Amino acid sequence: MTQVAVIHAAFGDTPHTVALVNVPELPSLNETLEYAYRWTNNVMGSWSIKKEVFEDGEPNGDYNPNVTVMKPLTKDDSGQEWGHRSTSMGDQILVGNKKYVVAMMGFETLEGEKV
């Protein structure tokens, strides 16, 4: 497995590491980036709420034991816990010692080269 860090930096956010993702050995850098991107997106639930099934009995299709949430979740005034946003264009993924940026389509280096 390769461990990568997902850094939310889009939308004017101060960059912060939100997750470490243990990526199975995949044949290409692009597939490694895609895996980290997919499993830090809210598609069928919440990637950051670490429950396989929600309190209402619905399955959390975005639960992945290979994802470790690094930034604490927030709670509102009523105590409701809220998950993190999806990884988006402008966010970064650190593989080894090199950062990649989520582009409009795919990924780029910090210098703007397509992956």
State what each model feature region is.
Residues 1-12:
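A short beta-strand micro-motif
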Residues 24-95:
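Short, conserved turn/kink motifs that form compact alpha/beta structural patches or helix kinks used as
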Residues 83-115:
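Short, compact, well-ordered microdomains
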Residues 13-18:
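Surface-exposed loop/edge segments in extracytoplasmic proteins
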